């Protein structure tokens, strides 16, 4: 009799435990619900998380546990368990496949253990590996607070409640663990959970595979490791091909997302799937990792050397932006590292040019392609993402970064620039001899998409880019033997010097206008004193300023001031910079030739 009572007590205790489990399954907290499921073994009523598919409950097991319970109680318990099972199955349908994603919430990831494996040893150079201060990065937690740099109007802005989800794609090679983890954590912290379908980390064959493998444990994080070095371009395509989100969001591996960065991007893509949108890119100091808000008055552009640069918006554009600070900003080019694009539109547009190598020029190519093939490029002011800007690349390029950039850039130019490619060659003469390989597939893509000519792009998207053939007498680099006139990195009130010609434009790109201005960007070579032997300087171009007016004498290869018998001279450039001396046709240091001149 006692044995029978004990047996009944054990059974009732078991039923009580089952009731608690059923109660817990009815909770509304999905993450807690998932955690409880994980904690159950595979031999009970619930399937273990590691199983790929949910398996039906085994009626035999249930009956074995409950076979001595009164029929009425058994029926009630069966009904509750069946209801819980159905809830579980429906919830599982909404979750990503368990075999593809980790099961550790980002807040429970062992940050210290992950970062400590690459901690600097005493005496090690903190800049050596990543070209930013690794010690400073490692000392900052992954969930640190950064200032909200958005315009105040953004804080009251509302976005669609039915936004598409996104796959965030991050490629990396030997990235600092602390910087990579901080990027991931900022995405989770600053984004609505339901909008992040997954974060895809593409490890471009880092020296230590565990850099990415250990992050694979985090929920919603997938890691794809290349079996050899493929570079950013192909790595991004690899990530995009496995993405399941409706929108692709590309980020660099050393970023920090700001408040509500994602919603305005997705909202704009939802409004028009052909909108390709980028956040305002704030600056994270490479030295101390301070987070600094960037100007909202900038848009992406380029010179005829096809190197990306930031342009200030025109006065008209700035006035419009003042009236509506949250309005999208049309941009001729995106920086390339951070943007969102509808996945189907990305595929339809031809993804990236896979015959480009490693890195460089891909932002130029996709910007041309989006605009010329009926899309839009925009910067979204209410979206802010910080980025660590470095002075040099932390890794080597097979073949050399300069050669790869030249090849990639020329591929883009050959496909998209039509007859205007001549001005690229004038600015970068060395590009004429670069072999770009077969571009027939990209030309066929352009035909298939019925894309617009580059002339349309210049007239409708980037009218600020001056067309040399119309406005200039001469253009490109100003040569003196193997050396070229160079700004030496100076801006307004800066002197000029000589530097070996690198044929890459930039500091060596000038033009001679019909008005006689020797221009570099919006700066003009200016006579500061009419006495011989005084340096010339770069000052803001002012229409009609006689001190900024020179004439070219092709017969004598001189650049002579329009009103004075003074010619640009490099005789003392190492001590005073370029000076204006009395013109001397026999002087070698006064001989200058433009790489492209209408007078020749």
Curated annotation (Swiss-Prot):
Organism in which the protein naturally occurs: Biomphalaria glabrata (Bloodfluke planorb)
Physiological role: Catalyzes the initial reaction in O-linked oligosaccharide biosynthesis, the transfer of an N-acetyl-D-galactosamine residue to a serine or threonine residue on the protein receptor. Has a broad substrate specificity. Acceptor peptides include Muc2, Muc5Ac, Muc1a and Muc1a', with Muc2 as the best acceptor. Acts on non-glycosylated and mono- or multi-glycosylated peptide substrates. Transfers preferably to threonine rather than serine residue.
SMART domains (UniProt xref): RICIN (SM00458)
Enzymatic reactions: L-seryl-[protein] + UDP-N-acetyl-alpha-D-galactosamine = a 3-O-[N-acetyl-alpha-D-galactosaminyl]-L-seryl-[protein] + UDP + H(+); L-threonyl-[protein] + UDP-N-acetyl-alpha-D-galactosamine = a 3-O-[N-acetyl-alpha-D-galactosaminyl]-L-threonyl-[protein] + UDP + H(+)
UniProt region (Catalytic subdomain B), positions on chain: 328-390
Matching CDD domains: beta-trefoil_Ricin_GALNT2, pp-GalNAc-T
Keyword Kinase: no
Keywords recorded for this protein, A-Z: Disulfide bond, Glycoprotein, Glycosyltransferase, Golgi apparatus, Lectin, Manganese, Membrane, Metal-binding, Signal-anchor, Transferase, Transmembrane, Transmembrane helix
GO MF term set: carbohydrate binding; manganese ion binding; polypeptide N-acetylgalactosaminyltransferase activity
Origin organism lineage: Eukaryota, Metazoa, Spiralia, Lophotrochozoa, Mollusca
Family of the protein in this entry: Belongs to the glycosyltransferase 2 family. GalNAc-T subfamily.
Domain Ricin B-type lectin: 466-595
Database matches in PANTHER family: N-ACETYLGALACTOSAMINYLTRANSFERASE, POLYPEPTIDE N-ACETYLGALACTOSAMINYLTRANSFERASE 2
Name of the protein: Polypeptide N-acetylgalactosaminyltransferase
Residue intervals on the Lumenal side: 29-600
